[in-house]
Regions:
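N-terminal subdomain of nucleotide-sugar transferases
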Residues: 1-63, 250, 408-411
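Carbohydrate-associated surface elements
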Residues: 41, 178, 199
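A short helix/loop element that forms part of the nucleotide-sugar donor recognition site in Leloir-type
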Residues: 50-58, 206-219
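Conserved donor-binding/catalytic core segment of Leloir-type glycosyltransferases
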Residues: 220-236, 241-245, 257
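Nucleotide-activated donor-binding/catalytic signature segment of Leloir-type glycosyltransferases, i.e.
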Residues: 259, 265-293
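Short hydrophobic beta-strand element within catalytic cores of glycosyltransferases
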Residues: 300-303, 321-332
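Conserved acidic donor-binding segment of nucleotide-sugar-dependent glycosyltransferases
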Residues: 343-344, 348-355, 364-370
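A short, well-ordered alpha-helix in the C-terminal region of glycosyltransferases
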Residues: 357, 364, 371-386, 395
Length: 411
């Protein structure tokens, strides 16, 4: 069985970002299947080229996975219009790359950005193969709610494209139970939808590690370290974290660590400087393989999003990493991910945007280390049982088997 995936933001463990698709692909390859991934030659988080090649398409091999890197116009930290240009450049060149992959049995697209899903649909039509569409975020709803997409004509076109792809897909895969409900509400038959939620490989994280090397490097010895790991964009509500840090400026034992990059990073660093925050450190993005050590150096972790109704539907990847690392989550996101944290007993929920409540939660955990550790242990146990990436890879293989009619099982 040969799976072809078109995914502009695909990340390997050597890059920052989520590695869901790498982990699924690796386990398929280990089981004797073939996987080709058409990806951008730009990291979506850093904007750096991931290949040294100068052509439009560069071939790599990663743990037996064939990765075809397609040239993408750079648009990091630029306007929405330039980002559309970047998406369109990948959409066009990815089709050419996909047609170089040889015979395939299934074509998979993933959204957002929705344009790469168009590429996957077109390749599936040309190859006369089933088309599996993965919905990772509800686009364009998120873009509309954030205020990034405002033009009525573009919104109408986006809605039409969304409906077109839902109809044309052989099957739909979602990573949050709320997305399944959303699609059913859009008229997609329930039997056409499969749920494989975001999750984590627990073996990547050692809950007993304490990250002594990084604590020394970042001068965090003796501190209660509260880490946010992820994008620094408009949606992520980092200003709430900075306001909480401002409230805790006199709590010398508490330090906030912001790990990541994004369009708002420069503005956020300027804001922290203007506030005179000496209890906040920005360390930039880190490759996935380094995140175990980063989280080991942390005592508690943060997940924040703006208080927008659509964000109540999402399962943020970072939360599952926090759980597997055995660290409690201070969660300023309502909805389905709150249900996970509360079911696990793995953290504290605070209302989105409420910096006072966030600061109170930090103090609560810093002053009761036994409670904090117990929450982290409960979080890891829950993630291992319910969100184990190895079990999810087996579910993914079974889904492919149903769609293709070929054995694609993983151990």
């Amino acid at each position: 069985m040969h799976l072809l995936l078109i995914h502009q933001a695909f990340a390997s463990p050597n890059e920052p970002g989520g590695t869901r698709h790498y982990e699924f692909a690796r386990q398929l390859v280990q089981a004797g299947q073939r996987v080709t991934i058409v990806a951008s030659d730009l990291s979506y988080l850093t904007g750096q080229r991931t290949t040294a090649g100068r052509g439009l398409i560069t071939r790599q091999e990663l743990d037996g996975i064939v990765v075809l890197r397609a040239y993408t116009y750079p648009a990091l930290h630029r306007s929405f219009a330039w980002r559309i240009v970047s998406f369109l450049s990948f959409m066009v060149i990815s089709v050419g790359a996909a047609l170089r992959a040889g015979p395939v049995d299934l074509v998979m697209g993933t959204s957002p950005p929705i344009f790469q899903a168009v590429s996957a649909w077109l390749v599936a039509v040309l190859r006369r193969r089933p088309f599996l569409l993965e919905v990772r975020d509800l686009w364009p709803d998120f873009a509309i709610d954030i205020g990034v997409l405002r033009n009525p004509v573009l919104i109408a076109l986006s809605r039409w494209l969304e409906r077109f792809l839902y109809r044309r897909a052989t099957h739909l895969l979602v990573n949050s139970p709320a997305y399944r409900d959303y699609l059913i509400g859009k008229g997609v038959p329930q039997e056409k939808i499969s749920l494989i939620p975001n999750g984590v490989d627990p073996e990547m994280f050692d809950p007993e590690a304490r990250g002594e090397r990084l604590r020394a490097e970042w001068r965090l010895d003796g501190k209660f370290v509260v880490t946010y790991a992820g994008a620094l964009g408009l949606a992520n509500d980092i200003p709430t974290i900075l306001r909480a840090a401002d409230r805790l400026r006199d709590q010398s034992e508490v330090h906030f660590l912001l790990v990541g990059d994004g369009k708002e990073r420069a503005n956020l660093e300027a804001q922290a400087h203007q506030l005179g925050l000496t209890n906040v450190t920005f360390v930039g993005s880190r490759p996935k393989f380094e995140m175990a050590e980063v989280l080991a150096a942390s005592d508690a972790c943060l997940a924040t999003l703006r208080d927008i109704p659509m964000f109540r539907t999402t399962y943020p990847n970072k939360v599952f990493d926090y759980m597997a690392a055995g660290r409690p989550t201070i969660l300023a996101i309502d909805g389905v991910i709150r249900q996970v944290i509360e079911a696990a007993g793995g953290g504290i929920f605070v209302p989105p945007g409420d910096d006072a409540a966030l600061a109170t939660a930090v103090i609560s955990l810093s002053q009761d280390r036994a409670r904090s550790r117990a929450m982290g242990q409960a979080a890891r146990a829950y993630a291992v049982e319910h969100f184990n990436r190895r079990q999810q890879a087996a579910q993914f293989a079974e889904l492919i088997e149903r769609l293709v009619g070929t054995k694609a099982r993983v151990a």
